[in-house]
Amino acid sequence: YKIRRGKLNHIFISHLHGDHYFGLIGLISSMALLNREQPLHLFAPPGLEEIIALQLKVASTTLPYELVFHPLNKEEVILDTPKFSVETFHTQHRIPCWGFLIKEKKLPRKLDKEKAINLNIPAAFYSSLKMGYDYTAKDGSVVYNKQVTLPNSPAKSYVYCADTIYDERLINIAKN
């Protein structure tokens, strides 16, 4: 996916079968060798912290950055950023297993800069226009947001659910 390791700040593990986390210790160690400094957040079922701690201990490895473990215990929003959110849901597997619904937040409107300039709207108000606000000039005249902006692309979402049997409930989670 061509994501630079330095930009990877959150990792989501669905369950504790080896094919879903065995490569994690290698990634964590590689990040240490590359002098990572910012914390790495791991969202996983309880137990992963002990597994990683044992692997680091046996290898006599001290990380130059913090591992922050977030145990998955219930269906909830586990991460909420200005750009996206992540929520968990149970899936049907032999051991506790989680799916993840990643939802992009509503994108700001697109500004037609040429129209804004022609209507003498100062650049300082452009971000407000993108957020949906109208502009009121000093003389009291109003330029409505829709006069100088266009809707952005609809927000996207992505559902990750691995190693699960057929479950009607997942259809509703994955809709839209």
Description of each model-found segment:
Residues P46, N73-K74, E104-K106:
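Non-catalytic surface loops within mature trypsin-like serine protease
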Residues Y1-F43, P71:
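Active-site metal-binding motif and surrounding structural segment of the metallo-beta-lactamase
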Residues L24-L27, I52-Q55, L170:
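Hydrophobic packing residues within well-ordered alpha-helices of enzyme cores
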Residues R36-P71:
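Active-site neighborhood of divalent metal-dependent phosphoester bond hydrolases
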Residues N9, K83, N176:
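Conserved acidic residues
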Residues P71-N73, A162:
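Short loop/edge segments at beta-strand edges and connector loops
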Residues P82-I173:
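Active-site-proximal loop/helix segment associated with metal-binding centers of metalloenzymes
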Residues E75-D80:
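Local beta-strand/beta-hairpin segments that build beta-sheet-rich folds
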